[in-house]
């Protein structure tokens, strides 16, 4: 039996307290993590040895059960990713671990220098060598292969080199059993906390530019760069978490605290950089149209996961499957209705809409259909010339598969899957027909959906 030298752990499985956590949970996690480490490729002896140390600490210090449970949970979810060989999964594994540390201890400094810290440090060693180097290079190369940007390209080589050198240096220094003041000085000289800032700063600049762009290709580039930015910030934090633990090992607590503070500041800066995504203004609707619907894009889903970690407020209220009333912001007594005109079905603004009359249905790919529920089944679609036609087809096609872009003032903008940069608006005419306008149509294209 894997834990035969700790039989008492199994005898007291039912012991539970809010402070200490369930022993049954930590037992299960210990077994899963140990099995995963033994099955993983590569050299995991150090991690297995550290796991044994963690078991011993749980035996002698019951108050560590709760902390160990949370850390083992984050490590367990990360192990398969760290050994996957896939850059995106590896960085997602990094996120699992740093998020686990942040929620359990408030940061690496709070971990102390006990068995939990040693175990986490040994797990970080699984990727801070060649995996970190290869992952950083892979996500940078992937983003730049899709978007030509000479300024970013110039800084990319330096960023890849910085990550590679720093991770390799930390790995070597972790092999030292006793760190001297001289060793700590060498570490500080070779892994300064400000490394990687140039490239991350360049990405912040591109994100800022792309936020207000009127070019669909630039908006797509900005969203891809947002994902790259999130990945690099997390990789940087992961390296510095390992660095902070290393300083604690050398009893340089003031330096470890400084590193942790640098991480905290950079996490706040990342939140500031990404905050606009969930508080869009109309001029940022195009990047919002690339980002939404989040469930339709693997890139957007990954970004959302990172924003939660950085502390960015959630996306505003999502649209559900039910009837809504779409009221125009410019003519706030007019809402969308339909009419028959010369054999065609048209959508327009009407002043006599009292009840929700547009049925919104979410499709499996995350987009929506908008169907008039007052008369025969009509889907709103964008015609090639911009008209909001009604179609009787069961599936209106990507001309009628809609996305809703939430704005910070509670209104929405609407565009189709085929033309993400053409937004639904109510035209200035006696008929008030519903049409589409390229980029921000102003308040005529802002809708209150109730």
From Swiss-Prot:
Highest taxon of the lineage: Eukaryota
Organ and tissue specificity: It is suggested that CrTX-B is synthesized in the tentacle, is modified (become CrTX-A) and then migrates to the nematocyst.
Signal sequence range: 1-18
Localization: Secreted; Nematocyst; Target cell membrane
A GO term from the CC aspect: extracellular region
The record's account of how the chain is modified after translation: Contains disulfide bonds.
Major localization listed first in the record, in broad terms: secreted
Keywords tagged on the record: Cytolysis, Disulfide bond, Hemolysis, Ion transport, Membrane, Nematocyst, Secreted, Signal, Target cell membrane, Target membrane, Toxin, Transmembrane, Transport
GO molecular function terms listed in the Swiss-Prot or TrEMBL record: toxin activity
GO BP: any one term: monoatomic ion transport
Record family assignment: Belongs to the jellyfish toxin family. Type II subfamily.
Primary role: Has potent hemolytic activity. Is lethal to mice and crayfish. Causes cutaneous inflammation in humans. May act as a pore-forming toxin, disrupting normal transmembrane ion concentration gradients in susceptible cells.
Subunit-structure text: Oligomer.
Misc. comment: CrTX-A and CrTX-B are encoded by the same gene. However, they differ by their molecular masses (43 and 46 kDa, respectively). In addition, CrTX-A is primarily localized in nematocysts, whereas CrTX-B is only detected in the tentacle without nematocyst.
The protein's name: Toxin CrTX-A
Organism: Carybdea rastonii (Box jellyfish)
Lineage: Eukaryota, Metazoa, Cnidaria, Cubozoa, Carybdeida
């Amino acid at each position: 039996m894997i834990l035969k030298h700790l039989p008492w752990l199994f005898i007291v499985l039912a012991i539970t307290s809010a402070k200490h956590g369930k022993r049954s949970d930590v037992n299960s996690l210990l077994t899963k993590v140990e099995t995963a480490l033994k099955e993983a490729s590569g050299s995991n002896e150090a991690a297995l040895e550290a796991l044994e140390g963690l078991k011993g600490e749980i035996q002698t210090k019951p108050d560590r059960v709760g902390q160990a449970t949370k850390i083992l949970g984050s490590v367990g979810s990360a192990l398969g990713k760290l050994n996957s060989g896939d850059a995106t999964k590896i960085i997602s594994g990094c996120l699992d671990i740093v998020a686990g540390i942040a929620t359990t201890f408030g940061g690496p400094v709070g971990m102390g220098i006990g068995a939990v810290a040693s175990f986490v440090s040994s797990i970080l060693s699984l990727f801070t060598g060649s995996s970190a180097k290869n992952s950083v290079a892979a996500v940078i190369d992937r983003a730049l292969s899709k978007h030509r940007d000479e300024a970013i390209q110039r800084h990319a080589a330096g960023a890849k080199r910085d990550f590679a050198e720093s991770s390799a240096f930390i790995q070597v220094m972790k092999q030292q059993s006793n760190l001297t003041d001289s060793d700590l000085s060498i570490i500080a000289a070779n892994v300064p906390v400000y490394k990687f800032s140039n490239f991350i700063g360049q990405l912040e600049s591109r994100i800022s530019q792309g936020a207000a762009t009127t070019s669909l290709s630039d908006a797509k580039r900005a969203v891809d760069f947002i994902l790259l930015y999130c990945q690099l910030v997390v990789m940087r934090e992961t390296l510095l978490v390992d660095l902070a633990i290393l300083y604690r090992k050398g009893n340089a607590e003031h330096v470890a605290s400084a590193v942790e503070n640098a991480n905290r500041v950079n996490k706040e800066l990342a939140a500031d950089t990404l905050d606009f995504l969930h508080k869009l203004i109309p001029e940022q609707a195009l990047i919002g149209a690339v980002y939404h619907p989040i469930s339709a894009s693997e890139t957007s889903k990954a970004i959302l996961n990172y924003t939660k970690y950085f502390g960015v407020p959630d996306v505003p209220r999502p649209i559900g499957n039910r009837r809504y009333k779409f009221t125009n912001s410019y003519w706030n007594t007019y809402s969308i209705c339909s009419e028959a005109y010369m054999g065609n079905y048209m959508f327009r603004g009407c002043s006599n809409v009292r009840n929700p009359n547009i049925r919104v249905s979410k499709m499996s790919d995350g987009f929506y259909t908008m169907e008039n529920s007052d008369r025969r089944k009509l889907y709103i679609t964008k015609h090639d010339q911009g008209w909001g036609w009604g179609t009787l087809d069961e599936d209106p096609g990507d001309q009628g598969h809609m996305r809703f872009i939430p704005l910070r003032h509670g209104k929405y903008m609407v565009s189709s899957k085929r033309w993400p940069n053409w937004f639904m608006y109510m035209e200035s005419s006696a008929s008030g027909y519903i049409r589409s306008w390229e980029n921000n149509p102003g308040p005529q294209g802002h809708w209150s959906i109730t």
